[in-house]
C-alpha cells in the first residue's frame, strides 16, 4: 500500500507540473496598456517574426522607458516593432494598443472570446486558461494552466488523501 501511495504522489506531482506546462513568465517593466476595449483581430494565419538581434533587443529595451516606443524587451519577452504583436516564448501575443492576451499560439483565440486583461490585481479567464497578476516590483506574472490535466491532478491528489486517511484509521 505504501508503494502504491508513493507512486500516486509522484504521479500527482508530475501531473501538476504538466498541467501548468512548466510555463511561468515574468515581464518586467512598463506594460502597454489600452482602454480595456475588446477589438476583433482581422486576418487569417500570420507568420511569427524571428526574434530580434541582441542590438535590436538592447535598443528596444532602452527606448521604451517613456512608453512611447513601439518596441519593448525583457529577459524573457520581446515586443516586435511594426509586427503589431507581443511575443513571449512563441506562445502568447498582444495586439498594439490593448492589454488583451491570447493563449494557445500566436494566431489563435480571437480577442473578445478567450481574452484576459493584465492589471494591478490577479486576473483569470477560464476560456484561455490564463492567470496573471502584477506584483509590487511592476512584474506581470503569467501562468498558463491546462484545465484537463489540472482536474486529473486534483483527482489524483484526492485519491492520495483518501488512501492515506483510510490507512491511518485502520491502525486504530
Swiss-Prot record:
<keyword id="KW-0472">Membrane</keyword>
<feature type="glycosylation site" description="N-linked (GlcNAc...) asparagine">
    <location>
        <position position="135"/>
    </location>
</feature>
<feature type="compositionally biased region" description="Low complexity">
    <location>
        <begin position="53"/>
        <end position="69"/>
    </location>
</feature>
<keyword id="KW-0325">Glycoprotein</keyword>
<feature type="topological domain" description="Extracellular">
    <location>
        <begin position="23"/>
        <end position="140"/>
    </location>
</feature>
<keyword id="KW-0812">Transmembrane</keyword>
<protein>
    <recommendedName>
        <fullName>Uncharacterized transmembrane protein DDB_G0291364</fullName>
    </recommendedName>
</protein>
<keyword id="KW-1133">Transmembrane helix</keyword>
<feature type="signal peptide">
    <location>
        <begin position="1"/>
        <end position="22"/>
    </location>
</feature>
<feature type="topological domain" description="Cytoplasmic">
    <location>
        <begin position="162"/>
        <end position="172"/>
    </location>
</feature>
<dbReference type="GO" id="GO:0016020">
    <property type="term" value="C:membrane"/>
</dbReference>
<feature type="region of interest" description="Disordered">
    <location>
        <begin position="27"/>
        <end position="69"/>
    </location>
</feature>
<feature type="glycosylation site" description="N-linked (GlcNAc...) asparagine">
    <location>
        <position position="138"/>
    </location>
</feature>
<keyword id="KW-0732">Signal</keyword>
<feature type="transmembrane region" description="Helical">
    <location>
        <begin position="141"/>
        <end position="161"/>
    </location>
</feature>
<feature type="compositionally biased region" description="Basic residues">
    <location>
        <begin position="29"/>
        <end position="42"/>
    </location>
</feature>
Amino acid at each position: 500500500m505504501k508503494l502504491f501511495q508513493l507512486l500516486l504522489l509522484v504521479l500527482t506531482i508530475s501531473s501538476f507540473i504538466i498541467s501548468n506546462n512548466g510555463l511561468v513568465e515574468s515581464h518586467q517593466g512598463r506594460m502597454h496598456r489600452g482602454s480595456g476595449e475588446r477589438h476583433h483581430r482581422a486576418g487569417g494565419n500570420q507568420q511569427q517574426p524571428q526574434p530580434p538581434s541582441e542590438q535590436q533587443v538592447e535598443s528596444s529595451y532602452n527606448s521604451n522607458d517613456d512608453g512611447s516606443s513601439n518596441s519593448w524587451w525583457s529577459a524573457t519577452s520581446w515586443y516586435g516593432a511594426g509586427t503589431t504583436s507581443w511575443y513571449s516564448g512563441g506562445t502568447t501575443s498582444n495586439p498594439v494598443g490593448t492589454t488583451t492576451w491570447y493563449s494557445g499560439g500566436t494566431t489563435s483565440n480571437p480577442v473578445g472570446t478567450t481574452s484576459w486583461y493584465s492589471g494591478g490585481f490577479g486576473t483569470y479567464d477560464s476560456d484561455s486558461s490564463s492567470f496573471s497578476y502584477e506584483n509590487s516590483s511592476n512584474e506581470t506574472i503569467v501562468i498558463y494552466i491546462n484545465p484537463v490535466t489540472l482536474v486529473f491532478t486534483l483527482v489524483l491528489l484526492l485519491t492520495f488523501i483518501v488512501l492515506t486517511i483510510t490507512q491511518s484509521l485502520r491502525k486504530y
